[in-house]
A protein has these predicted regions:
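Short secondary-structure transition hinges
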Residues: 68, 75-114, 122-123, 148, ...
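Generic hydrophobic, amphipathic alpha-helix propensity
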Residues: 15, 40-48, 52
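Amphipathic alpha-helical packing segments from all-alpha helical-bundle domains
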Residues: 46-49, 96-121, 129-134, 141, ...
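Hydrophobic alpha-helical connector segments
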Residues: 39, 53-79, 132-135
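Short coil/turn segments at alpha/beta junctions that flank glycine-rich nucleotide-binding fingerprints
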Residues: 4-8, 59, 80
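Solvent-exposed, amphipathic alpha-helical segments
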Residues: 1-4, 47-58, 138-149
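Helix-turn-helix
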Residues: 1-35, 39
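Amphipathic C-terminal alpha-helical segment
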Residues: 75-79, 83, 111, 115, ...
Length: 186
């Protein structure tokens, strides 16, 4: 219901009716509407980092890793439960507890990407994390844009285009040559 109507327009009475429980039973489990919302948000924000990590671990070929990571975001926004709307388009994004969860989720996704970037380039962690955040930010924004425009470009094609863009950037980073993890010029 939060996905359909937003936080402010959703009443606990409606939630109890939809869940086929009494309102007192609902309040036994969740002291308030925000607590319920945060529990659902925790459930949804746990999904994307798993998709990203799985994508990165699916191959050792970096171009394929980029493609799989990009597609993980397209998969997340295309899910039937529309959980991405609660995560990225919440009317509560200015609520500190909500913002912290979304930032943590994006940080976990960026961390996963940065591990690969750091291993392959030897860049310092802060730089690798910045690149990871750039990658996941691009994926998140483009996947949401693609879905909002009615998916006239098939998912596979849209994902491929974005992966090509991402790989052209990431593939241009110099690999460390001596196996020490030191980036040339660092």
């Amino acid at each position: 219901m939060f996905v359909e109507s937003g936080y402010h327009a959703t009443a606990m009475d409606e939630i109890a009716d939809r869940a086929q429980v009494s309102k007192p039973v609902l309040y036994q489990h969740f002291p308030g509407k925000l607590d319920l919302y945060l529990a659902l948000l925790d459930l949804h924000t746990a999904k994307l980092p798993v998709l990203v990590t799985t994508a990165l671990e699916s191959t050792t070929d970096n171009a394929q890793r980029v493609a799989a990571t990009v597609d993980a975001f397209f998969e997340f926004v295309e899910r039937k439960d529309a959980a991405f709307r609660m995560v990225f388009e919440s009317d509560l994004i200015n609520e500190p507890a909500v913002a912290e969860r979304v930032e943590r989720m994006m940080g976990l996704c960026a961390d996963s990407v940065s591990v690969v970037v750091k291993e392959d380039t030897g860049l310092p962690q802060e730089q690798a994390h910045l690149i990871g955040m750039a990658m996941v930010g691009m994926c998140q924004v483009v996947a949401r844009y693609w879905l909002s425009k009615g998916t006239s470009i098939p998912r596979e094609e849209a994902s491929r285009l974005v992966a090509t863009l991402g790989w052209r950037g990431l593939g241009g980073l110099p690999l460390h040559e001596d196996g020490t993890g030191e980036h040339p010029g660092a």
